[in-house]
Amino acid sequence: MTIVNKDSQSAIEQKKKKRTTLTFIVGVCLLFISVYLNLAIGSSKIQFNDILSYVTGHTNTKATFLIHNVRMPRMLAGLIIGGALAIAGLLMQAITKNPLASPQIFGVNAGASFVIVLITVLIPSLGSYSTILAIIGAFLGGFTVYTLSGSTKSITPIKLALAGMAIHLFFSSMTQGIIILNEDSNDTVMFWLVGSLAGIKWQQIIFILPFLLLAIFVTIFMGRQLTILELGDDIARGLGQRTEIVRMIVGILVVVLAGVSVSIAGPIGFVGLIVPHILRKIIGSDN
């Protein structure tokens, strides 16, 4: 019986490895196709030879100029921000044990949006510092949620979710109030609130890339801790985990990732919610 169980377990593990490998290969292929379509399709269609010339650096034509200054930054920003929001959503779902959790439930997106809209309306000259302001707003939302959830030892996933939803609604209401009272700034503010990757510059890419790399490193490093945490606080504490510290570290990481993403692309919440579920469906639930 033991031998049969071991063989069955080994077969399941081999099947999981094959599925993960196949998923990775298909994902990479789809990524390359998406990158090509993003660079080639637009108001001016760019041929494959022009894209290849840009990659190899052999020519300096109008097409390569368009790729380098417009489409490549936009494409990279989409990849980085999508990855950042997906990781933020995964981390939120892990620490709250709520399958519907995303940076929005932590009050992060709403806090970042509120600060940016407020500064855009009152002090437009500070618009160049939107990324820093968004991070400050995200920390404001996250810290408020953390404070309302109770003391460090009394924080529970339910308290965190309820406090996050309350703060999200509060900041969203404040943002809408600012828009209503300042009609002159409506066009600029509404364009940003809708979300867009238009006009992304290389400087912004260079600024946000380290945050994604840090998030990937920390997520991989804490993967086992997050898996243990999903078993429940009592079991995690019984295994020697300091659940409060883990949640605090993950919460700070979520705040930074969401704040940076919101400052560049606007308050996008769906990516952080749906991507973790897609990946769990394909490769399993182990963090």
Which sequence ranges carry the predicted segments?
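Alpha-helical transmembrane segments in inner-membrane proteins
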Residues: 1-287
